[in-house]
Swiss-Prot record:
Secretion signal, residue range per the UniProt entry: 1-19
KO phenotype (gene knockout): Homozygous knockout mice lacking Slc39a5 display normal fecondity and seem normal.
PANTHER family: SOLUTE CARRIER FAMILY 39 (PTHR12191), ZINC TRANSPORTER ZIP5 (PTHR12191:SF17)
Subunit structure: Homodimer.
Family in the record: Belongs to the ZIP transporter (TC 2.A.5) family.
Full protein name: Zinc transporter ZIP5
Modified sites of kind Phosphoserine: S333
Membrane topology: Multi-pass membrane protein
Glycosylation sites: N49, N158
Principal localisation: membrane
């Protein structure tokens, strides 16, 4: 590969500048040779037969990052970020005062034979003489009365607009001398950064839109509470366990997917605003993490099934020898009869007391919580934790909807998939503590109100005078990963008793479905944004 295009263009512009002020320089040979070198490099890369066609100019502008704005700018005539561009009045004054000085500069530029490869141009008379053909082009370029509406020198110009501004034909090939005239404009476009996308500040209407969408999301997330109570009443323990296993795996997939594919990329400043290639590059690392998590989850569960099947005949044989109940689900009765004389009455009474004093199994998803201390203090701790949990969920939703609709949608789905098994476990434990269904519904309404407060706080932190969206996203991603990998995933990997193959496959399906759902939303993020009115 040849030298970078930016270096070639910089060297060419330096050569042209030296040529312009060459009236006071006695020897212009090195400057012309350097200029010819860079011209030859550029025309060798993008030109044809010593000229630069419209297609070659378009490829050059694309390589320089010019010719097309890559996103919304701060305003149609506002300066780019980090640079004080001149105002419209300054531009107009500059153009009114420029011709006399510019003619003196152009007068020093050597337009005689310079080795540029154009025989007709090499025969052009010197500007110090009376050659009207040479002065005609320069005076049209310098003295042309460009209006503010026609000469958009503060906008990102494509190839056709550049040529029209310079009085050149958009379809005719460019000679090296004509291309040298465009060099300062290209350098100015690069320096002013008018073709670089800068994020637009959030207008006041976006605050109302973010508040509305986050409030609706919090109301939608209050549905898991009555759904949990309904499932606890309708489903028995035998059906509740596989359903909770599937929902728990779905929650792990959605929480990890939202953290890795949405929250962390947005917290680091990456946005899926470009083509699909840029989107795939942003999603690649997070998707690979999800793939590794899914593979190891299925591998560990498969090894557990194999180990359990290898140990089951020996365990069953030992239990039959001891006369204990056989918990093998494939056994129809689940019990093994033994003679009455094999055990004395005190032993039978002790086994009966142990069975009565053993605590009841908590629903899956809450195996990590300690339920040894009975009483009202446990219920209040659970309620306090649920209120704080809803407050942080509302905070995450407010920040997500402040960033965009697709980001808020993915966070809403992730929180919903996590809330259903979480509420099932909490309500099952509170029912064991003696709380009624009516009190549980009332407490769920109180925690939902805290979620609304958290959503308003998240919008205020994200769209306030000092935007804290990256910090909120980073904190939310950490919370989601902790809940998924520390609180929920160990419950799926360490069940209280070995799971059948169907349950393991159901959990794998839930994990895969949750990650795929977040990945689909990330891919369709650009298509989801226009579906929301601007407020």
């Amino acid at each position: 590969m040849g030298p970078p295009v930016h270096h070639l263009l910089t060297g060419l512009c330096v050569g042209v500048a030296l040529g312009w002020v060459g009236g006071s320089v006695p020897n212009l040979g090195p400057a012309e040779q350097e200029q010819n070198h860079y011209l030859a490099q550029l025309f060798g890369l993008y030109g044809e037969n010593g000229t630069l066609t419209a297609g070659g100019l378009a490829r050059l502008l694309h390589s320089l990052g010019l010719g097309r704005v890559q996103g919304l700018r701060l305003g149609h005539h506002e300066p780019p970020t980090g640079r004080a561009a001149p105002t419209s009045g300054d531009n107009f004054t500059h153009r009114l005062q420029e011709p006399e000085l510019s003619v003196d500069i152009w007068a020093g530029m050597p337009l005689g034979p310079s080795g540029w490869g154009d025989q007709e141009e090499s025969k052009a008379p010197d500007l110090h003489g009376s050659g009207p053909s040479s002065l005609d082009l320069f005076q049209r370029l310098l003295l042309l009365d460009h209006s503010l509406a026609d000469h958009l020198n503060e906008d990102c110009l494509n190839g056709s607009q550049l040529l029209v501004n310079f009085g050149l034909s958009p379809v005719a090939p460019l000679t090296p001398r004509q291309f040298a005239l465009l060099c300062p404009a290209l350098l100015y476009q690069i320096d002013s950064r008018v073709c670089i996308k800068t994020p637009a500040p959030a207008p006041p209407g976006d605050v109302l839109s973010a508040l509305l969408h986050s409030g609706l999301a919090v109301l939608f997330l209050s549905l898991p509470a009555p759904l949990s109570l309904l499932l606890l009443r309708l489903l028995g323990p035998r059906l509740l366990r596989p359903v909770l296993g599937f929902l728990g795996a779905l929650a792990v997939g959605t929480l990890c997917g939202d953290a890795l594919l949405h929250l962390l990329p947005h917290a680091q400043g990456g946005r899926h605003t470009g083509p699909s290639e840029q989107s795939e590059e942003d999603l690649g690392p997070g998707l690979s993490v999800l793939g590794g998590l899914f593979l190891l989850f299925m591998l560990e569960n498969t090894l557990g099934l194999v180990r359990h099947r290898g140990l089951r005949p020996r365990c069953c044989r030992n239990k039959r020898d001891l006369g204990e109940p056989n918990p093998d689900p494939e056994d129809g009765s689940g019990m093994v009869l033994r003679p009455l004389q094999a055990a004395s009455e005190p032993e039978v009474q002790g086994q009966r007391e142990n069975r009565q004093s053993s605590p009841s199994l908590a629903p899956p998803g809450h195996q990590g919580h300690s339920h040894e201390h009975r009483g009202g203090s446990i219920a209040w701790m659970v309620l306090l934790g649920d209120c704080l949990h809803n407050l942080t969920d509302g905070l995450a939703l407010g920040a997500a909807f402040s960033d965009g609709f697709s980001s808020g949608l993915s966070t809403t789905l992730a929180v919903f998939c996590h809330e259903l098994p979480h509420e099932l476990g909490d309500f099952a434990m509170l029912l064991q503590e003696g709380l009624s269904f009516r009190k549980l519904l009332l407490l769920s309404l109180v925690s939902g109100a805290l979620g609304l407060g958290g959503a308003a706080l998240g919008v205020g932190l994200s769209l306030g005078p000092v935007p804290l969206t990256p910090w909120v996203f980073g904190t939310t991603a950490g919370v989601f990963l902790y809940v998924a990998l520390v609180d929920m995933l160990p419950t799926l990997l360490r069940p209280p008793e070995p799971l059948p193959v169907f349950h393991v496959l159901l959990q794998g399906l839930g994990l895969l479905l949750g990650g795929s759902l977040m990945f689909t939303i990330a891919l369709l993020e650009e298509q989801l944004v226009p579906t929301v009115p601007d407020g």
